[in-house]
């Protein structure tokens, strides 16, 4: 089972809000997921992102692959840097 960390669209028409979910790569975008690890609101001027950093780092260390957009959000939040530092320290 290949696991991805990706966005799931929520909110109403023309007002998107996203959850950052861990899901099987074969599941549909808004379908079944394993765990919610954060949220992303692109409509706020500062692009509000909330994350459960420990859970994201755990999923990344277990081999979950982030989508391109999620990878950018994690990089801006500093999570990818922590992940690479922990990977290099082993």
From Swiss-Prot:
User: Which keywords are on file for this protein?
Assistant: Ribonucleoprotein, Ribosomal protein
Gene Ontology molecular-function annotations: structural constituent of ribosome
Q: Which cysteines are joined by disulfide bonds?
A: none
Keyword check for Kinase: no
- State if Ribonucleoprotein is listed as a keyword: yes
One GO biological process this protein is involved in is: translation
SUPFAM superfamilies assigned to the protein according to its UniProt record, in alphabetical order: Ribosomal protein S16
Q: Which domain of life is it from?
A: Bacteria
Q: Which Pfam families match?
A: Ribosomal_S16
One cellular component GO annotation, for this chain's record? small ribosomal subunit
Q: Which family does it belong to?
A: Belongs to the bacterial ribosomal protein bS16 family.
Q: Which NCBIfam families match?
A: S16
Q: What is this protein called?
A: Small ribosomal subunit protein bS16
Which source organism does the UniProt entry give? Answer: Lactococcus lactis subsp. cremoris (strain MG1363)
């Amino acid at each position: 089972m290949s696991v991805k960390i990706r966005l799931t669209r929520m909110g109403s028409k023309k007002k998107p809000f996203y959850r950052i979910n861990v899901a099987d790569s074969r599941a549909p975008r808004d379908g079944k997921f394993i765990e919610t690890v954060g949220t992303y609101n692109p409509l706020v001027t500062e692009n509000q992102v909330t994350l459960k950093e420990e859970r994201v780092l755990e999923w990344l260390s277990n081999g979950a692959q982030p989508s391109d957009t999620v990878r950018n959000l994690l990089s801006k939040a500093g999570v990818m840097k922590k992940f690479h530092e922990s990977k290099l320290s082993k």
